[in-house]
Amino acid sequence: MASSPTDPPPNFFKSADGLDLAYREMGEGRPLVLIHGLFSNGWTNWIRYGHAQVIADAGFRVIMPDLRGHGQSAAPHDPSFYPPDVLAADGEALVRHLGLTDYDLGGYSLGGRTTLRMLVRGARPRRAILSGMGLEGILHTGKRQGFFRHVLTGIGTHQRGSGAWMAEAFLKTTGGDPQAMLPLLDSFVDTSRDELAKIDTPALILCGRDDDDNGSAALLAEALGEGHLVEIAGNHMTAVLQSALGQSIRDFLTAE
């Protein structure tokens, strides 16, 4: 992908364990950290379909990391680089690196779960966005972990048109490294209902109407102290293509 006004070049910061992790920025104004989903990257999730531009145009500095194992970030194969909650720790390292104190935070799918884990661990953004995520995907990560392990260990064997086949096709589109993704799955951490109930950050729960990959978004909104549900068209893969995704995030962040 060539650098252009809509494809900003990556910057890099060091993780706590010394890896070089990439992030991109668009816009000026209030900082918003947006985290992408599994097999994706910051460009694909947030820039490619115009979401980052819509939000930046509303007066935000949109900061989009590539998770370890993804995009232009380091992608080690050694399982020791993927301890529990490492993605939340990386998010915290980025916030420290940029010196952010008053900011907003969100993500899609795995990025939404990572945002939630950061909240549990003490992050205090003004507002949070949990998109492409439901209650089951927060309480019990094992189901999705098992699905993606099946995808990664069966590459080239999945039935055409199946969910696993489509996930593999997406991985190939983004150039993901299966040998880095596999140990990353073991870093997923479950969150309890009690932990959810203690979160008082206003949170947008944003999900496609046909997306039940991670369980019920409505139940996730109910489980949070200040969860606000918004549904848009699409399923887990196609909701990202909808302009309503970026517009809904913008509207939530700019509301009084």
Question: Locations of the language-model features?
Answer:
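Active-site loop/oxyanion-hole signature of alpha/beta-hydrolase fold enzymes
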Residues: Q53-D57, M64-D104
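Short beta-strand immediately N-terminal to the catalytic nucleophile in serine-hydrolase-like folds
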Residues: L105-G107, S131
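Catalytic histidine-centered segment of alpha/beta-hydrolase-like enzymes
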Residues: N235-Q247
